[in-house]
Amino acid sequence: MERRLKTLMDGLTFGEGPRWYQNKFYFSDFYSHKVYALDLNGNYDVIVEVPNQPSGLGWLPDGTMLIVSMKDRKLLSFKDNVLEEMADLSELAGFHCNDMVVDVHGNAYIGNFGFNTYAGEEVKSTNLILVRPGEEPCVAADDLMFPNGTVITEDGKTLIVGETYAAVSYTHLRAHET
């Protein structure tokens, strides 16, 4: 059987934060400030525009979409076509926020650059931020070198965080949260 590649979309500037949710492929295109959804037939829609660049995506148990707003270091919620601030991450993030993973309980784990890469600042460690529904943001893990590519294993017991500037992955065993 011959397989052929088919372009479903072009013109993207920087695709980020890919997630599969309810039979659609969602992702941020952060330089165009848009969040897209692509269906199984190759049709796509702009879901929302985020003024300060979208990055990581996830969902609360009730279906509310969560979006990391990079430049202003905020966690946003998007439901019923309303984009709102859910949490201000700026006190815990050293620079722009980026990737995120959300567990089945709605706990969001959010990475950040830790330093201003564009100004040539020295590489330095930062925090992985945790936002639980209805609570203030807190530090889930510290001393990480640009936490990114975070995933939770299928059984929900292990959080794996890629550290871009350390060239390693950090594994954290999580207790089951209710």
Q: What are these language model-derived features?
A:
Residues 1-3, 122:
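Blade/loop signatures of beta-propeller domains
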Residues 4-8, 43-48, 84-89, 136-141:
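A short beta-strand motif characteristic of beta-propeller blades
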Residues 9-22, 50-69, 74, 91-115, ...:
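Beta-rich, blade/repeat-based domains predominating
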Residues 29-39:
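Beta-propeller domains
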Residues 31, 71, 118-125, 164-165:
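Short, solvent-exposed loop/turn segments at conserved positions within beta-propeller repeat blades
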Residues 34-36, 74-76, 127-129, 168-170:
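A short loop-to-beta-strand structural motif that recurs across blades of beta-propeller domains
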Residues 39-42, 79-82, 132-135:
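Short loop/turn segments that connect beta-strands within beta-propeller blades
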Residues 171-178:
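Conserved small/polar residues in nucleotide/adenosyl-binding loops
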